[in-house]
């Protein structure tokens, strides 16, 4: 709980004023805010093996501290032996306290555990949101390496209220995300 309070406090005391002066906002309501973090795992192999969904839900719940939900297919695709409403993925949407806890864990613990880590790409979506692809779930400390049956990757999307990529980059950089080729201010 103290981590959450520290990140929120850091945003209010240091990050928000820095962004306000950097972009010359006239109102505090214009300052970009991290709205939510969405973690998604696409599990195409779940068509053949139903147990993968249960394992992925348990792992995602352990990583995020919030119950994961199975995503289902919307239509039949015969070539992939896929039927409508079959579970084919797992996702979690984090907001408020859990969002800040997960962000803290991601930046301070998980990302430094990636092999040959040199920073994350700086590709945004044009509206200030950022998606990070992770190859292995074993970088999180909650996952016991001996008990996993399959290495699974995931997408982590940071949804911000930023209007431009530059504002979103500045916000996430202030939160401590280690971008490659970070611009020196």
From Swiss-Prot:
Keyword tRNA-binding: yes
Source superkingdom: Bacteria
Cross-referenced InterPro entries: Ribosomal_uL5 (IPR002132), Ribosomal_uL5_bac-type (IPR020930), Ribosomal_uL5_C (IPR031309), Ribosomal_uL5_dom_sf (IPR022803), Ribosomal_uL5_N (IPR031310)
UniProt GO MF annotations: rRNA binding; structural constituent of ribosome; tRNA binding
GO process terms (BP): translation
Pfam families: Ribosomal_L5, Ribosomal_L5_C
GO cellular component: ribonucleoprotein complex; ribosome
Keyword Hydrolase: no
Keywords: Ribonucleoprotein, Ribosomal protein, RNA-binding, rRNA-binding, tRNA-binding
Protein family membership: Belongs to the universal ribosomal protein uL5 family.
Subunit-level organization: Part of the 50S ribosomal subunit; part of the 5S rRNA/L5/L18/L25 subcomplex. Contacts the 5S rRNA and the P site tRNA. Forms a bridge to the 30S subunit in the 70S ribosome.
Full protein name: Large ribosomal subunit protein uL5
Organism name: Bacteroides fragilis (strain ATCC 25285 / DSM 2151 / CCUG 4856 / JCM 11019 / LMG 10263 / NCTC 9343 / Onslow / VPI 2553 / EN-2)
Gene name in the database record: rplE
């Amino acid at each position: 709980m103290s981590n959450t309070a520290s990140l929120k406090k850091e945003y209010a005391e240091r990050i928000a004023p820095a962004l306000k002066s950097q972009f010359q906002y006239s109102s505090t309501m214009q300052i970009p805010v991290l709205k939510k973090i969405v973690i998604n795992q696409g599990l195409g192999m779940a068509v053949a093996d139903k147990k993968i969904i249960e394992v992925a839900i348990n792992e995602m719940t352990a990583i995020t501290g919030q119950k994961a939900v199975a995503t289902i297919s919307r239509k039949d695709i015969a070539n992939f032996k896929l039927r409508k409403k079959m579970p084919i993925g797992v996702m979690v949407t984090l907001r408020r306290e859990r969002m800040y806890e997960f962000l803290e864990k991601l930046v301070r613990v998980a990302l430094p555990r990636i092999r040959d880590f040199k920073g994350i790409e700086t590709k945004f979506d044009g509206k200030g949101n950022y998606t990070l692809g992770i190859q292995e779930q074993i970088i999180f400390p909650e996952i016991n390496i001996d008990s996993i049956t399959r290495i699974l990757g995931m997408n982590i999307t940071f949804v911000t209220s930023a209007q431009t990529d530059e504002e979103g980059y500045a916000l996430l950089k202030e939160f401590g995300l280690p971008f490659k080729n970070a611009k020196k201010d």
